[in-house]
Amino acid sequence: SPTCIPSGQPCPYNENCCSQSCTYKENENGNTVKRCD
């Protein structure tokens, strides 16, 4: 079974995250990327 994605790492869907929450965050370059909460 796939392991969950830790907080702060890029994610496609909420279900992929250990926290079950993947939201858009702005990175240092001003780009918006979905990452686990």
Curated annotation (Swiss-Prot):
Principal location: secreted
Molecular-function GO terms, alphabetical: calcium channel inhibitor activity; toxin activity
Residues with site note (Critical for insecticidal activity): 10, 27, 35
Secreted is among the record's keywords: yes
InterPro entries: Omega-atracotox (IPR009415), Omega-atracotox_CS (IPR018071)
Entry comment, domain topic: The presence of a 'disulfide through disulfide knot' structurally defines this protein as a knottin.
Protein name: Omega-hexatoxin-Hv1e
Species this chain originates from: Hadronyche versuta
